[in-house]
Amino acid sequence: MRFDVAIVALKLTTKRTPLASARIALDLMDEGVIDAATALERTAELQEEDLGTLRLASQDTPGTQVEPLGQGIPASPGVVSGEIALDGQRAAARAGVGTSVVLVRQDAQTSDISALELALGLLTQRGARTAHAAVVARQLGKVCLVGCESLRIDLSARTVQIETMLLHEGDVITLDGNEGAVYSGAVAAVMVPDEVLLERLQALRTSQAVAPAHRKHGK
């Protein structure tokens, strides 16, 4: 089942990460949907230190190497760790007590949008980077891997199998949305600034700081 476009449009007016908010505002400005003043207003409170992508920490130190359980298609970048949640009810219950969760589904459905907002990431067995689930994840700034063909979900047993590894709902996994890898447990990550996005944002702020002076001078 695919996401309903109207519902997606409604849901995407809710919470986004700073990185997603900046990217969306700048893209809309570049496409002519909003003007520069509106883009500036929408990004005014964003801090540069928040505009980055998490990547796996260096594993050069002996003994720190970790091997992925499986591979999927990287659909939205970043690195997140959280408990496996197999449905929206579980995601809401665990997120409600402050626990980080990763939503794991065969294929995302319309009813999963609310759960995706609560989760840090999404892992699906089916789908492609252009699937609605992936688009929604990118708009919300959620890490997303789709098309993980080695993923098997047993809802009756509340278990997940990736290759030969059997995991239970509540076990912690890490999604690497940059490389499309799934890991068992929590894997250390570091924030890497999005230099291209920062340059675009700085150019916007500089141009809008100069514009009022030009208008004043022209009066």
Report residues per predicted region:
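Terminal amphipathic helices with adjacent charged low-complexity linkers/tails
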Residues: 1-63, 168, 179-200
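Short secondary-structure boundary micro-motifs
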Residues: 10-11, 16-17, 67-68, 105-106, ...
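Generic hydrophobic-segment detector
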Residues: 15, 22, 68, 72, ...
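Long, charge-dense accessory insertions within large macromolecular proteins
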Residues: 31-33, 37-97, 101-109, 122
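Acidic, glycine-rich flexible loop/linker segments
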Residues: 78-91, 95-100, 106-219
